[in-house]
Each structure stands twice: as structure tokens, then as C-alpha cells.
């Protein structure tokens, strides 16, 4: 199989439509929701839900590429399409992209670790009448990237055949919209990672679907953040939370193999290139706006000249373009592998590392070149700079992903290389 570098026609058509949405509905409201962090853009959410339903989908999730009987067989492009959608929406506003209705990380966890019956049960709601959200609850105070240190516990009540969960989760992206029962939204859920056997380490870790409105769950607070302010980030407390036995994703039997941990990692292998795509969208927004401002000032970027003949600004802009394109190619490889059912743990982490680096560098350089105007709220350059950093932090920090890359390349285990 070969990777095609030309954008498939179905993807190009989607990008054309989304660019209008990104420009007119997202970019135009960026500043307001940046300065009013916990307001909810209900009109955008409702519009996107209606639009996605009209195209046969209910959320930003990869569509089934299986051809209908008798139809021409085409290469799978589900994750490639999703990456292109996310990049364009993040180009509009990455905070808005993060509140686009759908399953998000919560649905990705069900997709990666759930049974066919669980996927049918929990994922169908995203194509319902109302916008619906799901979130993943993994991070804890003192247990961020070290998943083996998770202290949230799930104990089986033999009498009722229910799991009883206790713990607290922090930095839950979309936690409020996924769990709080808003009249405008459908019934969402959160996926809580907890240990069913503390002595087993990562092997005892499992994910549980907790439906919105479940007793014992409370939103403790919403974070005030540096960037992505249109998206809510919650602290969630779980006190004697009871969920049905069948809401555990995967087997309830603890074995020596780290089955639960592998379920979490499978989720990230699928989503890290998509996080990278969102960062690339932010970087492209900053770079394109910078070039527009330079053009207004009659500053020409002369491509094709030897480097020593270029001005400092020309070198900077060309370097920014190189960084952007190289990062996008890594994303394309990772999502192509996901579409073709190839193991992409290495490529997934590589794309995340590269995007986390370049989006920070490109947005910072754009602010520098713009000078005081880049630092001013008159333009969005300073906002893109603030929005950029999260790409390197969530869904595996740059440091963690560098470890993943090194282990794969050198052939070391997690114990051998920390």
C-alpha cells in the first residue's frame, strides 16, 4: 500500500465547507469566548450538531469505511478525514473545536476498549436529536502521566452486581458538558479510569462508563486556563458512585498482562495524531495571518533565493512553513496507518511531539515579528500563542511522547528506559 499525498476529493469538499464555518462562526467569536471563559456558545454547538447529522454522522469520529455490497472498493480514509476536519476547525478556533458536539476522548475510549455491544449502546446517542458530549477522566492530582499511580478505586458490590467508584479526577476536558444535564444537550457520559486491584499496578486499571446524572458525581470546579478558553476543563469528584456491572470496558478479570493499560494506550494511539492536527491548525492560522499582515506592509517573501540573500523575516517565515509542512506529513502518516489497521504507536507519538514543538515556535515567532501588535489584543496573535502550548501537554506530554519514541526506536521496555 502507498500513501497518497494528494488530498482525496471527499476530504477536500469537507474542508471547503468547514472553512466557511471556521471563518464565520468560530474566528469571528474567538475573542469574546476567550474573555468570557465559561460562557457556552450554544448556537455554534447546535449548528454543528445539525450539520453533522445532515451528512450522516453524529460526532467527530472516524466513519465506517466499509463499502456497500457491490460498490467500488476504495482506500479507507476515516482517520485522514477526521484529521483534516480537526485541522480546519482548529484553524478557526481550537477552543471551539474542542466543544464541537460528539464523543471526543470518551467515545474514543469506548471505541478502543469496549465490546461491540458496548460500542452500540454508548455511541449511538451522538447521532440523536440533541448535541451530546463524552469525556475521559484519567488524570489525578499526583498521577498525571504516571497512570500506574492512579488512586481512584472501583470495587464490585457482589450483592447488587454494581461497581462502586471513589476518587477525584482533574483536568477533564469537556467534563461539564459531558456530565451536567443541560436542557440543550443530550445525555452524555464520562469514562473514568480506576483500579479494580491496587496490587496489580497497571494490569488492574480499567475504564468505566458513568452516565450523566449518576448520583455521587459532582463537578467540583471549572479551571481558569491560559488558552483554549472556549472549552471547559473540570475537576470531578466521585463518592460511592454506583454503575452497572456491564459498564466496565473490557474484562473484569485481572491478569498479569496490562490489558487495561493497553486499552488506554490504544485510545491515545488513535487520538494523539488528531491532537497534533489541532495544533497544526493553530499554527497555520498564525502563519497565514502573519503573511497577510506582511503583505499589507509590502513585505515580500522571495522564495527560491539562496538563504544568504534572504532578509531575516523571509528566513523566519520560510522556516515556519517548513516546520508546518513537516509536522503535517507526520500526522498524515499516523492517520493513514490508523485507517489501514497498522500499529502506529511510534508514529502517533512522533506526530504529537513534532506538532507540540512547531505550534509553540510558530505562534511565538509570529508574535515576535508583529512586535507590539502581536502582543496586543487588537489581533489574535497573542491568543494563538496562548492556545498553542496545550498541544504539548494534554494526551501525553512532549516528554512522555519522547520516551515512547525512544523506546520504540531503541527496542527498550518501559522498565528499561524511564
For each of these PLM feature ranges, what is it?
Residues 91-94, 143, 170-177, 228, ...:
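Glycine-rich phosphate/pyrophosphate-binding beta-alpha loops
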Residues 162, 166-218:
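A short core secondary-structure module
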Amino acid at each position: 500500500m502507498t500513501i497518497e499525498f494528494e488530498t482525496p476529493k471527499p476530504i477536500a469538499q469537507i474542508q471547503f465547507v468547514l472553512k466557511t464555518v471556521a471563518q464565520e462562526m468560530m474566528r469571528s467569536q474567538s475573542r469574546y469566548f476567550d474573555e468570557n471563559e465559561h460562557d457556552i456558545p450554544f448556537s455554534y454547538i447546535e449548528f454543528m450538531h445539525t450539520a453533522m447529522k445532515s451528512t450522516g454522522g453524529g460526532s467527530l469520529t472516524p466513519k465506517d469505511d466499509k463499502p456497500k455490497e457491490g460498490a467500488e472498493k476504495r482506500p479507507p480514509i476515516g482517520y485522514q478525514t477526521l484529521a483534516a476536519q480537526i485541522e480546519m476547525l482548529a484553524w478557526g478556533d481550537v477552543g471551539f473545536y474542542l466543544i464541537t458536539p460528539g464523543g471526543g476522548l470518551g467515545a474514543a475510549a469506548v471505541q478502543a476498549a469496549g465490546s461491540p455491544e458496548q460500542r452500540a449502546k454508548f455511541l449511538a446517542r451522538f447521532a440523536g436529536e440533541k448535541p451530546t458530549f463524552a469525556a475521559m477522566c484519567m488524570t489525578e492530582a499526583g498521577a498525571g502521566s504516571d497512570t500506574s499511580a492512579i488512586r481512584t478505586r472501583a470495587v464490585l458490590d457482589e450483592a447488587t452486581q454494581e461497581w462502586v467508584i471513589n476518587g477525584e479526577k482533574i483536568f477533564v476536558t469537556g467534563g461539564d458538558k459531558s456530565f451536567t444535564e443541560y436542557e440543550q444537550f443530550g445525555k452524555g457520559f464520562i469514562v473514568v479510569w480506576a483500579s479494580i486491584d491496587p496490587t496489580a499496578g497497571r494490569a488492574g486499571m480499567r475504564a468505566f462508563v458513568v452516565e450523566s446524572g449518576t448520583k455521587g458525581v459532582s463537578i467540583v470546579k471549572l479551571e481558569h486556563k491560559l488558552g483554549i478558553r472556549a472549552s471547559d476543563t473540570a475537576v470531578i469528584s466521585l463518592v460511592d458512585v454506583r454503575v452497572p456491572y456491564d459498564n466496565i470496558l473490557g474484562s473484569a478479570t485481572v491478569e498479569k498482562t496490562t490489558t487495561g493499560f493497553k486499552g488506554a494506550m490504544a485510545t491515545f494511539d488513535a487520538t494523539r495524531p488528531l491532537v497534533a492536527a489541532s495544533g497544526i491548525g493553530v499554527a497555520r492560522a498564525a502563519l497565514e495571518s502573519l503573511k497577510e499582515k506582511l503583505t499589507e506592509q509590502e513585505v515580500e517573501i522571495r522564495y527560491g533565493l539562496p538563504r544568504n540573500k534572504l532578509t531575516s523575516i523571509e528566513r523566519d517565515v520560510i522556516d515556519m512553513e517548513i516546520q508546518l509542512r513537516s509536522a503535517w506529513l507526520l500526522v498524515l502518516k499516523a492517520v493513514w496507518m490508523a485507517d489501514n489497521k497498522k500499529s502506529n504507536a511510534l508514529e502517533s507519538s512522533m506526530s504529537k511531539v513534532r506538532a507540540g514543538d512547531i505550534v509553540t515556535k510558530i505562534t511565538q515567532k509570529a508574535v515576535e515579528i508583529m512586535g507590539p501588535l502581536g502582543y496586543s489584543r487588537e489581533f489574535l496573535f497573542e491568543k494563538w500563542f496562548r492556545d498553542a502550548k496545550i498541544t504539548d501537554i494534554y494526551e501525553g506530554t512532549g516528554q512522555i511522547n519522547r520516551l515512547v519514541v525512544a523506546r520504540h526506536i531503541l527496542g527498550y521496555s518501559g522498565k528499561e528506559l524511564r
